[in-house]
Amino acid sequence: YRSAEEYISEHKSMGKIQCLFKTPKKDFVTIKKGRVCLHPWAFISADDKLLFQESNCYNTKPEDHWVFKTLKLPQAKHLKGKALFLSFRRNYWHSLTDDSSLLNLLEATSIDLESFDHIICERPDNVASQQLQEIWNINQNKLVSLTENKHLECEELSFLAGSLSLAYTPILQTREKILSKIKNIQEKPSKRLIASREDATTRRWLNQSECVELLTGRFNFECILPSERNLFEQAEIFNQAEVVVGIHGAALSNILFMRAKTTVIELRYRGQEGNFSSASCYEELSKLVGINHITVLCNGEERPELRGRSIEDANILVDKTELLKIVESCL
């Protein structure tokens, strides 16, 4: 089927679709005897057919989907009752934007998380992710890992579908919920931050130490490692920033907490682009928050060993002279 909508229109007794947000369109899909598979990524209907639009990652034609190149899917684990698919990623960006937005939309339409017997979502592996789940009172006893189980068949499966674009209202609701828990927020942002990814294994900033030395010495920047801080500490320090410099990656998710008319300088590999790239996600978030967003395209080294992620997760080499000029123009 081209989409869940097409499937349900042909099999009305097998599911329903509820519009949660009109622009960008966000639909809440519920299907009976639905399946979700991790490798290859796929939502599958009760009659054993792919729901292409909801399962599409890297292909423009249904017949090119990886599910049709797979000899056998992993054995499915059966879940009785109602299951909500939230996420299969342990990824700060997706938790803060996609997952939190869905939870806000469900809350706004009075869909109670407690009405689900299972929540398909990974258990937190860091304090920030744990705090996010606590904000929405996610019952840890209901969590089911798709990463561990690979393939789940649900008596009733619900999930979000529609546009991948960020939705203004639920995004800002997440921002306000988190910032409201922080005491003594400064009136005027004053910090100049460099968001480091030195603990990451992909998308590394190859000459970070040289750039940090220049920015801290000339412009009084402070280099931080956001992953070492909890959710509220990350939100607070980004809320205090007038300028943030950082490589494209999870740490920049915290620009959600910055104030309007502040500045983000995103460092990105120049080859990162295309229909199935996340290249513009931080620019989109900055636009919603009202931030001045400057993207610096950099040379770098691709990672062939990462296969489909070789360009998306390439390491970068920043032109120091160009960076200094851009930073100076922002101060």
Region roles according to the model:
Residues 1-331:
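The feature primarily captures lumenal catalytic ectodomains
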